[in-house]
């Protein structure tokens, strides 16, 4: 029996000696490699925080002392140590273990969101609450890093944390130089410089001792050298970052040396005020394929071989992902248009811009985990005569809504937002679903929003989007492979007709308006209507927003209109169409199918859609049921 088999709670860590702790760390890494290889998940980040997490649980008393994990994907080791080891075979699967902290799973989990840079604000609020309620014996610890320090919210929180000199709060910086890919920007350079600081300090300590033996001459010499040293130091470390914020700074500490980390954390715990513990770690540590993966050190994987790290996913011959279709076509557009530039928020690989950057490196900008800055920076590029394309996950656009509204739309600027992972993403859970973008973008004045149904219409949508130079445009698509071509039986100026057929008895004319990726469900429902003797037509609008006048007029002659979307049904595309029909005086009953107004549990995309009644069979049955009530 290994050490890990004996650990079911943080209390089991307290009595382990140094050798046992080292063995435990090795066993946890092997456990992670075996389990995450079989299920997929965030392997690289968790291999890098094994010792950090063990030390945090040994020094602090969770759950009495909240441990907050920024971005959440660094929490696997925390889950292992808090009694959830036996659930890892179900990681990110329906009704299984969440890939992020989950308050329903354990009292040790204080937060749930997978969005970066929020942990310090949570921690600040918790520390204030403990102070106000007389629970000053409780400590709050936030593990931040893996790129989250590039987010502005982190620095807003640090500014507030530093103002309370006697409030106990420990910020552990996991400095692995990465988010998905290598962390960029001045902050990353400063953290790298801070790693050098002990070298300067050791050299100066040695010099001071040697010169001190020379009496007053030596003292004067040291003062001169010290002045030179400070000048050099401040060149390498321009603002000393954390100390100049008024925060006690400890480090850098080897994040894989348990003794060093524990000593630093114990000092921070007893300090009596806010403390930064700067640790240096290696993402993917202990798994050679991850360590050698220059792109992202296996930040997130599917099912892989636990020895070689090679993907074990079955590939459909000829299949191409939505992301790849976008990437390839944006390169083609940029080859013809020198004004096209691309922006990513620390996710060049996942959003398809890594390939674009290889072809057009000078026209690609990675701003770090800073979606708000990305959108307003894009506005500046547009003001300068360029057409920026900002590629982000749909869920992360939520953070930049004000910038889209006030910095882009108000100025009538031509900026294109490409929203990957729109709709239901599945295994990453509630905070990764892109089920709000049609609702929030749809209220922006002047905006154009497209939801293509397949690879060809994605290319056409992107062409239309970058042709607009006086308003923001949005192109959204889901996770996964783009379906094989879904042809139109007739193409109109503003919409495509995908299906047009009368039932034998034509008991009623039903129009199905399909917004984007659920077109196959719409077509299945149309065939079911015909089988039930109804007349059915399916249309796919070129623009979800604004609603084309020609589509409204086309809809006038039907007995029932049904809309289908993978967005929140409240305030979504269907409800917008319903409103526009009403305003046009078109009095046709409308039924909207979409995602309910609730946070969704994780599972595969197909499983979640089925639970929501948005699978092909249920959609067909529901639509026929609507028609039968005419």
Curated annotation (Swiss-Prot):
SMART domains, from UniProt?
Answer: Transket_pyr (SM00861)
One term of GO molecular function:
1-deoxy-D-xylulose-5-phosphate synthase activity
InterPro entries with a match to the protein in the record:
Dxylulose-5-P_synthase (IPR005477), THDP-binding (IPR029061), Transketo_C/PFOR_II (IPR009014), Transketolase-like_Pyr-bd (IPR005475), Transketolase_BS (IPR020826), Transketolase_C (IPR033248), Transketolase_CS (IPR049557)
Q: What is its EC number?
A: 2.2.1.7
* Gene3D superfamilies per UniProt: 3.40.50.920, 3.40.50.970
Superkingdom, natural source: Bacteria
Keyword set, alphabetical order: Isoprene biosynthesis, Magnesium, Metal-binding, Thiamine biosynthesis, Thiamine pyrophosphate, Transferase
Annotated GO CC locations: cytosol
Q: State the coiled-coil residue ranges.
A: none
Details of cofactor binding? Binds 1 Mg(2+) ion per subunit.
Q: Tell me the residue numbers annotated for binding thiamine diphosphate.
A: 73, 114-116, 147-148, 176, 287, 371
So which cofactors does this thing need?
Mg(2+); thiamine diphosphate
PROSITE patterns to which the protein is assigned, alphabetical: TRANSKETOLASE_1, TRANSKETOLASE_2
As its record notes, the protein acts as a catalyst of: D-glyceraldehyde 3-phosphate + pyruvate + H(+) = 1-deoxy-D-xylulose 5-phosphate + CO2
Q: Which residues bind Mg(2+)?
A: 146, 176
Enumerate the Gene Ontology biological process terms. 1-deoxy-D-xylulose 5-phosphate biosynthetic process; isopentenyl diphosphate biosynthetic process, methylerythritol 4-phosphate pathway; terpenoid biosynthetic process; thiamine biosynthetic process
* Pathway(s) it belongs to: Metabolic intermediate biosynthesis; 1-deoxy-D-xylulose 5-phosphate biosynthesis; 1-deoxy-D-xylulose 5-phosphate from D-glyceraldehyde 3-phosphate and pyruvate: step 1/1
Listed Pfam families: DXP_synthase_N, Transket_pyr, Transketolase_C
Q: What HAMAP family does the annotation carry?
A: DXP_synth
Assigned protein family = Belongs to the transketolase family. DXPS subfamily.
Its biological purpose: Catalyzes the acyloin condensation reaction between C atoms 2 and 3 of pyruvate and glyceraldehyde 3-phosphate to yield 1-deoxy-D-xylulose-5-phosphate (DXP).
Q: Which PANTHER family match?
A: 1-D-DEOXYXYLULOSE 5-PHOSPHATE SYNTHASE-RELATED (PTHR43322), 1-DEOXY-D-XYLULOSE-5-PHOSPHATE SYNTHASE, CHLOROPLASTIC (PTHR43322:SF5)
Query: Self-association or partners: how does it assemble?
Result: Homodimer.
Task: Kindly provide the name given to this protein in its UniProt entry.
Answer: 1-deoxy-D-xylulose-5-phosphate synthase
Gene of this entry = dxs
């Amino acid at each position: 029996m290994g050490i890990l088999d004996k650990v079911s709670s943080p209390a089991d860590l307290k009595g382990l000696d140094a050798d046992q702790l080292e063995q435990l760390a090795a066993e946890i890494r092997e456990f992670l490699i075996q389990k995450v290889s079989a299920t997929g998940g965030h392997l690289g980040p968790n291999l890098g925080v094994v010792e950090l997490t063990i030390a945090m649980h040994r020094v602090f008393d969770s759950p009495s002392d909240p441990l907050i994990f920024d971005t959440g994907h660094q929490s696997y080791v925390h889950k292992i140590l808090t009694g959830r080891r036996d659930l890892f075979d179900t990681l990110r699967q329906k009704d299984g273990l969440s890939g992020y902290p989950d308050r329903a799973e354990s009292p040790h989990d204080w937060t749930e969101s997978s969005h970066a840079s929020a942990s310090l604000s949570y921690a600040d609020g918790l520390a204030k609450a403990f102070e106000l309620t007389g629970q000053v014996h409780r400590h709050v610890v936030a593990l931040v890093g893996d790129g989250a320090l590039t987010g502005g919210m982190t620095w807003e929180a640090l500014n507030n944390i530093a103002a309370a000199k006697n409030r106990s709060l420990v910020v552990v910086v996991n400095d692995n130089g990465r988010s998905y890919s290598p962390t960029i920007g001045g902050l990353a350079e400063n953290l790298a410089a801070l790693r050098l600081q002990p070298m300067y300090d050791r050299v100066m300590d040695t010099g001071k001792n040697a010169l001190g033996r020379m009496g007053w001459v030596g003292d004067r010499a040291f003062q001169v050298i010290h002045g030179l040293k400070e000048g050099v130091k401040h060149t390498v470390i321009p603002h000393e970052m954390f100390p100049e914020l008024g925060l006690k700074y400890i480090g850098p500490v080897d994040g894989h040396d348990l003794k060093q980390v524990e000593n630093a954390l114990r000092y921070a715990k007893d300090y009596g005020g806010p403390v930064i513990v700067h640790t240096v770690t290696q993402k993917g540590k202990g798994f050679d394929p991850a360590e050698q993966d220059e792109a992202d050190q296996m930040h997130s994987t599917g099912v892989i071989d636990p020895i070689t790290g090679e993907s074990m996913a079955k590939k459909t011959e000829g299949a191409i992902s939505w992301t790849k279709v976008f990437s390839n076509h944006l390169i083609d557009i940029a080859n013809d248009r020198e004004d096209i530039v691309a922006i990513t928020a620390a996710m060049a690989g996942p959003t398809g811009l890594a390939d674009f950057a290889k072809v057009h490196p000078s026209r690609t900008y990675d701003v770090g985990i800073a979606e708000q800055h990305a959108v307003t920076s894009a506005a500046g590029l547009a003001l300068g005569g360029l057409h920026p394309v900002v590629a982000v996950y749909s869920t992360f656009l939520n953070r930049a809504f004000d910038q889209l509204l006030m910095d882009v739309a108000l100025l009538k600027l031509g900026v294109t937002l490409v929203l990957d992972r729109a709709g239901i993403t599945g295994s990453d859970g509630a905070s990764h679903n892109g089920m709000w973008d049609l609702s929030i973008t749809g209220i922006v004045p002047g905006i154009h929003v497209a939801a293509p149904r397949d690879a060809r219409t994605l290319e056409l949508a992107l062409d239309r989007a970058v042709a607009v130079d006086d308003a923001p445009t949005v192109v959204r698509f889901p996770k996964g492979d783009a379906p094989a071509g879904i042809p139109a039986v007739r193409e109109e100026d503003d919409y495509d007709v995908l299906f047009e057929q009368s039932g034998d008895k034509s008991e009623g004319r039903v129009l199905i308006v399909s917004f984007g990726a659920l077109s196959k469900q719409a077509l299945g429902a149309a065939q079911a209507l015909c089988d039930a003797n109804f007349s059915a037509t399916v249309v796919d609008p070129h623009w979800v927003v604004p609603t084309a006048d020609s589509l409204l007029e086309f809809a006038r002659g039907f007995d029932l209109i049904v809309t289908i979307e993978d967005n929140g049904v409240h305030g979504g595309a269907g409800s917008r169409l319903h409103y526009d029909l009403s305003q046009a005086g078109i009095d046709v009953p409308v039924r909207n199918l979409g995602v309910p107004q609730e946070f969704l549990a994780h599972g595969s995309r197909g499983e979640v859609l089925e639970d929501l009644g948005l699978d092909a069979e249920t959609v067909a049955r529901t639509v026929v049921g609507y028609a039968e009530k005419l």
